[in-house]
Amino acid sequence: AIRTGDEVTVSCAEGDSGHVYAGRVPFTTITTDLAALPMPRTRLMVNIGNPDTAFRTRFLPNDGVGLARIEFIVAEHIRIHPMALVHPDQVRDAAVRAEIERLTRNAPSPADHFVRELSEGVGTIAAAFWPRPVIVRMSDFKTNEYASLLGGACFEPQEANPMLGFRGAARYAHPAYAEGFALECRALKRVREEMGLTNVKLMIPFCRRVREAEDV
């Protein structure tokens, strides 16, 4: 037990959990002056997917975000397949439909839930690194990953090799996902035009043909 007047050392430098040591523990402080380090010719940009880590990561020496993945926001914050939000009536499982209704009840519409959550997540990342560029990759889930989202099984084909299948740019203009991609575009438009975070730049992933880029 610690008594009044006891000397202890409290350490928060050993991971997620703090430690308390009896007595005064000797330690060495190493200070590095980052301003004195020469800057490389190549711009160093970070990868990020979780908005919760954005404001911590921004303090690392960096030239912006080279890849901001939106899959974490969709899977952890939205949790619902975009097409299930556009067409909730097509979700056949009553329990899944009820869970979608519960998650979206505070939004004007299910589709607005997607736009709000995605724009707030991307906006947090963009604000943390402002005014440095933040390159946001549009969704690049594979079909099996999309199917694992709430309501996703109703909208995704089963593929022998999802890694090379219906993903990236090929999805965006396809009738099976065009309305879902429109929600992504609405969210990123809100980040740039309503939030004013014009440091956001878009990346279209897995573009296999020039025609796919033109269609997008």
Question: Which role does the model predict for each range below?
Answer:
Residues 1-4:
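Conformationally flexible catalytic loops at phosphate/diphosphate-handling active centers
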Residues 16, 22-25, 172-173:
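Glycine/Thr-rich beta-alpha phosphate-binding loop at enzyme active sites
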Residues 16-17, 160:
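Glycine-rich, flexible loop/turn motifs
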Residues 20-36:
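Short, compositionally biased
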Residues 31-216:
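Conserved alpha/beta-domain cores
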